[in-house]
Curated annotation (Swiss-Prot):
<comment type="similarity">
    <text>Belongs to the RANBP1 family.</text>
</comment>
<keyword id="KW-0963">Cytoplasm</keyword>
<keyword id="KW-0597">Phosphoprotein</keyword>
<keyword id="KW-0343">GTPase activation</keyword>
<feature type="compositionally biased region" description="Basic and acidic residues">
    <location>
        <begin position="26"/>
        <end position="35"/>
    </location>
</feature>
<dbReference type="InterPro" id="IPR045256">
    <property type="entry name" value="RanBP1_RanBD"/>
</dbReference>
<dbReference type="GO" id="GO:0005829">
    <property type="term" value="C:cytosol"/>
</dbReference>
<dbReference type="GO" id="GO:0005096">
    <property type="term" value="F:GTPase activator activity"/>
</dbReference>
<feature type="region of interest" description="Disordered">
    <location>
        <begin position="1"/>
        <end position="78"/>
    </location>
</feature>
<feature type="modified residue" description="Phosphoserine">
    <location>
        <position position="70"/>
    </location>
</feature>
<feature type="compositionally biased region" description="Basic and acidic residues">
    <location>
        <begin position="1"/>
        <end position="18"/>
    </location>
</feature>
<comment type="function">
    <text>Stimulates the GTPase activity in the presence of RNA1. May potentiate the action of RanGAP1 (RNA1), thus playing the role of a negative regulator.</text>
</comment>
<dbReference type="InterPro" id="IPR011993">
    <property type="entry name" value="PH-like_dom_sf"/>
</dbReference>
<dbReference type="GO" id="GO:0006606">
    <property type="term" value="P:protein import into nucleus"/>
</dbReference>
<dbReference type="GO" id="GO:0005643">
    <property type="term" value="C:nuclear pore"/>
</dbReference>
<protein>
    <recommendedName>
        <fullName>Ran-specific GTPase-activating protein 1</fullName>
    </recommendedName>
</protein>
<dbReference type="InterPro" id="IPR045255">
    <property type="entry name" value="RanBP1-like"/>
</dbReference>
Amino acid sequence: MSAEQEKKTQGTTKEEQKSSFASEDVASKQTEEAKAVFGDGVAKQENKSGASTNDEKKPAEGDEDAEPASPEVHFEPIVKLSAVETKTNEEEETVEFKMRAKLFRFDKAASEWKERGTGDARLLKHKETGKTRLVMRRDKTLKVCANHLLMPEMKLTPNVGSDRSWVWTVAADVSEGEPTAETFAIRFANSENANLFKENFEKYQEENAKILKKN
């Protein structure tokens, strides 16, 4: 290579270096201007790789699961309800007799006996009038399945083929609200209980007959 060509080559190299340094100065100047206007975050986004830097803020562990503590809230009722006393219409009566039994009702339409309920058959005597009625409630639900006065015309008759059950007819049973004529059959655990029921039934039936006769 001649001396003249070497000079040309060296001149070209110096020009390229100047151009490169000038480009770097321009880029640096633009970065500084961006920092001044938008802050350091914008300048970082102008990195050639475009990747996020390690200086980016990371969420603290457990922040997503953390819940702000709330104080316990207590609400007072706007309207205070007073206790309501439930009445059974038996408050003015005394229990003269009680025996567990199962009650049946004769369904005329189907011409068959249907179970009415299981519970305590009770003879309740009113404190003022002195009249006695038969009241029986179903277990658990306490729904009334028999409710009528022991009238003089009623007659207990043995159920066919059983020594522990009785059958009788009622002109006005009010267990369903409205008075209805019913035929009942009541069955006890044994004949002794059945006979005790019959004795007390007829005893208070006679007392009712005397009271009704006076009236």
